[in-house]
Amino acid sequence: MTIIRKKHPLIKIINHSFIDLPTPSNISSWWNFGSLLGLCLIIQILTGLFLAMHYTSDTTTAFSSVAHICRDVNYGWLIRYMHANGASMFFICLFLHVGRGVYYGSYNMIETWNMGIMLLFTVMATAFMGYVLPWGQMSFWGATVITNLLSAIPYIGSTLVEWIWGGFSVDKATLTRFFAFHFILPFIITALVLVHLLFLHETGSNNPTGLNSDADKIPFHPYYTIKDFLGILILLMASMILTLFFPDILGDPDNFTPANPLNTPPHIKPEWYFLFAYAILRSIPNKLGGVLALILSILILAFMPLLHTSKQRALTFRPITQIMYWTLVADLLILTWIGGQPVEYPFITIGQTASIAYFAIILIFMPITGMIENNILDLD
């Protein structure tokens, strides 16, 4: 068996990636989220595949086809709710994975980090298009509002929006193409994940100290396969509790009403995992400025390696920057809350303050605290 594992051209790749992979001996549970994201992706592809067998991407039948899946298809309700809540679990793992990367300075592995940012954008696009497919009120109006933001692009904006819509409004053509893209993108994501892993295995994993761990590596299997398995069990248990006991808790009640272009919901808002970015978008009165801030709220991650001023990699031994980091986390939670609130006083002011704080912490305060810590520890 050992000979096959190490010699066979295909099994050899799996062996080097998941079995004999030299891994730092001290990586904590924060390093579990990579494998959990892989599991989420597999669950989403499988449940999505079965949903696609029964779903129809036509404006007249899309809503009723989802109802048909829940009522008439064997375990259709389970597949549908696993897919919908699976997206939420996916984003929880994604945010924790990115947060871990920021905390422990993993962004210094630039190729892996940039690949991760590309993955984040692709997953967000996929989730957005998936939200449109049930063709409820929030699906329709969410699609209308978000796609309409592209009209802010100078000169080509209006033409671009009509091109994406396939007409003069969100309609049958839009739904059909969104379904096509939503179906194909997870497979593109899978390919990007392989490239992400390829880059990661070029440098090896980071670890909680942020120090070079070449002197202390252990094989991935059995030590981290068993650790990942525990994480997988916890994730599956959490997913099942969410799916079986609270299936609609993260959804919007407006989506139980079929899409009606003549009736606008009182508060148009996206799924919870986009609310922080939506709050940043809304906090800027200018349309183009809002769109740029929306894109920058994620793209700012790409500037992290350039903004790293500390002589240490991780925040493990940097208490001042730790305060900044946890303030940033609190700020993101505030933005998420504000994104779900109506556009009125005091929410507008809170949203604008939190948006300024978000960019200020990343662009100004964290680099400054890094330099202060260098001076305190005399690392210059």
UniProtKB/Swiss-Prot annotation:
Q: What is this protein called?
A: Cytochrome b
Q: Provide the protein's localization.
A: Mitochondrion inner membrane
Transmembrane ranges? Answer: 33-53, 77-98, 113-133, 178-198, 226-246, 288-308, 320-340, 347-367
> One GO biological process from the UniProt record?
mitochondrial electron transport, ubiquinol to cytochrome c
- The reply on keyword Oxidoreductase is no
Q: How does it assemble?
A: The cytochrome bc1 complex contains 11 subunits: 3 respiratory subunits (MT-CYB, CYC1 and UQCRFS1), 2 core proteins (UQCRC1 and UQCRC2) and 6 low-molecular weight proteins (UQCRH/QCR6, UQCRB/QCR7, UQCRQ/QCR8, UQCR10/QCR9, UQCR11/QCR10 and a cleavage product of UQCRFS1). This cytochrome bc1 complex then forms a dimer.
Q: Which family does it belong to?
A: Belongs to the cytochrome b family.
